[in-house]
Amino acid sequence: MRKDYIIKDARRILAEQIRDNGRNTMNENPITNATGLSAVIPKDNDGYCTVYKLDCADGLGLMTVYQVYPGIQLIYNDFEATSCYWDGNIGKNVLEINHCREGREGSVLQSGSCLYLGEGDLSIHTMDNCTSEMSFPLKHYRGISVVLDLELVSENPPGILTESGIDTADFKNKFCADGSCFVMRAKDDIEHIFSELYSVPDRFQKPYFMLKVQELLLFLCMVNVKQEKQRELYTS
């Protein structure tokens, strides 16, 4: 019997949220009626942080969403389940950057590419390329996603990106040309960016998330995709 773990509504709602300026969406979206969500817990009054609880046949998922900048969300993903299913595509100009902290995650994307993330690995793909099924073979997954609405970020870039002349709209062609998925295996550069995000004191979260998101985007601008793909061939 197939086990259903329905997160399609959460994914779609999150995509809709990042098209908002990232502040008042919770007051405008009837998210509490979404199928597959057992609880939606606003952690403040301005929509900055919201926790989504998702039930499944053999476990539980929690997504803690922070609206860091207009068009940029930082999401803590905690799953204690073996698999999840969802359907429906989301915007092709929305990128999802995933970092695996603990556990394993595997999926086959809409493009046919196989994605496998181990501890410390990073992946980038467009959200319309998301698979209908994700598996967690260890029945445990902990990680971070940074979701970018490329159009909105280009219109409202964070300060440092404006000064550097970087356009995040170029990320789609750089990392996801022809529907591909980019994977960078665990290395010190990735660990440096993400490791401290898992232990930030609450009172420092807002400024620290803003700094770390900008650091991540600057780092991705410097990534040599060709070299990383060659490294992937040698290490896989």
Write out the residue ranges for each language-model feature.
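Short Lys/Arg-enriched alpha/beta "domain-start" segment
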Residues: 2-51
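N-terminal functional module of multi-domain proteins
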Residues: 42-142
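Alpha-helical structural motif
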Residues: 6, 27-33, 73, 93, ...
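Intrinsic structural disorder
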Residues: 1, 52-59, 229, 234-236
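Bulky hydrophobic/aromatic packing residues
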Residues: 34-37, 41, 58, 86-88, ...
